[in-house]
Amino acid sequence: MFMEEKQNSQISLDFNQNIFKPSSREEIVEIVKNCYRKNIPLEINGLKSKNKIGRNFQSEKTLDLSDYKGVIDYKPEELYIKVRAGTPIKEIVEELDKNNQQLAFEPNDFGYLFSGESNSGSIGGVVSCNFAGSRRFKVGSVRDHILGFQGINGKGEIIKSGGTVVKNVTGYDLSKLISGSFGTLTILTELSIKVLPKPETSKTLVIKNPHLKKALDFLG
């Protein structure tokens, strides 16, 4: 089921609360603008699956993007999917499974380490951390699969870059810049991501060898 952005002519927000859970881009813009005008530190959260990584952020307000989710557009034949940043990884995987496709960079699943649930992170968090799995050696990291994005900077201004095709960039590729920026450059709102067919077969090998040279020789 694809989602459509709701355009609100009037936005009513309670700026006295400490945690904001917007469901539209317009609400996010107003929240950021208000915090910018009042010089209020704002913490950005998705599904909080990686909140235990790094030091605690000192903030007065929290922007919770867990409600800003959903598949916006998916074209299996054109090998791309467009989603909101708060969309859980598991929902994207389920959608791609219907057409035997995948996120080829294999997002790292730290759910069992931090939250106790598999695939508990959001796609925005994966891109912000640039976390890819072991297949990155063959297919590249997260940043190599981002076709385009929309985001909001610290002043509440909307930023757009790229599109939905591979060769669509002239000048500096901002999609690669925001990957791994941990939310410091923009609040991601939408992402267009390249998808690929699943392999017919796959295997996982565990090599138990304490000697680095022998392990490297085995990998050839």
Predicted regions: what is each one?
Residues 105-106, 115-220:
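FAD-binding subdomain of flavoenzyme oxidoreductases
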Residues 11-110:
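Glycine-rich N-terminal segment of FAD-binding domains in flavoprotein oxidoreductases
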Residues 1-2, 58-64, 117, 182-188:
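Short, functional N-terminal and low-complexity linear motifs
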Residues 6-13, 49, 70, 127, ...:
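A generic structural signal for ordered alpha-helices
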